[in-house]
Regions:
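Bacterial N-terminal signal peptides that target proteins for export
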Residues: 2-12
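Sec-dependent N-terminal signal peptides of Gram-negative outer-membrane/periplasmic proteins
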Residues: 2-3, 26-29
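C-terminal segment of classical bacterial N-terminal signal peptides
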Residues: 17-26
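Alpha-helical, heptad-rich or low-complexity scaffold/stalk segments
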Residues: 28-141
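N-terminal targeting leaders of membrane proteins
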Residues: 138-156
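Contiguous beta-sheet cores, especially beta-hairpins with glycine/small-residue-rich turns
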Residues: 150-266, 272-310
Length: 310
């Protein structure tokens, strides 16, 4: 019986993995003043702000720097954007904030800067502080690390680095359509060479490529996802896909969970998921369903130095 199951499993795995779509396109960097302001404001306040463009630029500059920059509208917007997102000579503001939050909570949230800073101040000292976000973040870093500079260093992250993720919402073959975005979060920390690269709680997305409803004659529903993207600790959007290593991890995961042959789901590029989430012939994956993806290519990312094992 065991041998028969293994033979059936091998055949099933071969069938389940015949489709594996790789997401290779990078998320487009906003180019216009409006688009960059929208993104900066969303990550700072929770949503884009209203009002004249110059008023919005002035507000961001005041909240982060306490002063106004000089130069053109585009130059000032670029300066704000770069300080928040660009990791070149030094880590970005969001990279530093992620590092602080992970050190305090061992998890990173997707809430806006103003909420994250306020929550951590209250958690650590019982009250909120005054001043710019930059000043308050430096103070949090000093409390968390004993210095206002975080132990963050650049690290080479190889292609095919595995990342365990969990669905942030229910996904079923009945409630999604082609082109929909599926949201997930990093389920476990990923540490490379002693540095935290992907922190638990970081967000990610995939796109529904194909949905096929359950049909007559015992034909089960199918769901294919593509264009996986996951945010690293330093805020970089990293392309990912379901490659051979991710498939093998999910195969072992499903078998370790005792998934039966009849209950394992074919989920297109996602691969094999535990059978406990299948209801009849439809695909029904609740929020929290875990799976594996892997990075598409080699990349340089900032990571927080940690003594935790990988």
């Amino acid at each position: 019986m065991k041998n028969m199951f293994q033979k059936c499993m091998s055949a099933f795995v071969a069938a389940a993995f015949f489709v594996s779509t790789m997401g290779t396109s990078f998320a487009a960097t906003p180019e216009t003043v409006q688009a960059k302001l929208d993104l900066c404001e969303t990550d700072t306040y929770g949503q884009p702000q209203t009002g004249a463009i110059m008023e919005r630029i002035n507000k961001l500059e005041k909240d982060y720097d306490g002063t106004h920059r000089t130069g053109s509208m585009m130059a000032r917007t670029n300066a704000i954007y770069d300080s928040m997102y660009t990791n070149t000579a030094t880590p970005s503001i969001l990279a530093e904030l992620n590092g602080i939050e992970w050190t305090i909570r061992h998890e990173v949230s997707a809430t806006p800067v103003q909420e994250r800073v306020t929550d951590m101040e209250t958690e650590l000292s019982g009250k909120t502080s005054e001043g710019t976000y930059t000043k308050r973040i430096r103070a949090l870093a000093d409390f968390a690390f004993g210095a206002n500079q975080l132990p963050i260093e650049q690290t080479s992250v190889a292609a095919n680095t595995l990342v365990k993720v969990a669905l942030a919402e229910e996904v079923t073959s009945k409630n999604v359509k082609k082109g929909d975005t599926v949201h997930f979060t990093v389920a476990d920390d990923v540490i490379v060479d002693g540095r935290l690269i992907f922190a638990k709680g970081e967000p990610g997305t995939a796109v529904v490529e194909k949905v096929q409803q359950a049909r007559n004659f015992g034909r089960n529903a199918k769901l294919e996802l593509t264009d996986y993207k996951v945010k690293s600790m330093d805020g970089t959007i990293v392309d990912a896909y379901v490659g051979e290593e991710a498939k093998e991890e999910m195969k072992q995961y499903a078998m370790a969970a005792g998934a039966s042959l009849a209950g394992i789901v074919i989920l297109g590029p996602i691969g094999i998921i535990g059978g406990a989430f299948v209801k009849g012939k439809d695909i029904d994956l609740p929020a929290g369903t875990e799976m594996y993806i892997e990075t598409t290519g080699d990349t340089m990312l900032y990571g927080v130095t940690t003594t935790l094992a990988k």
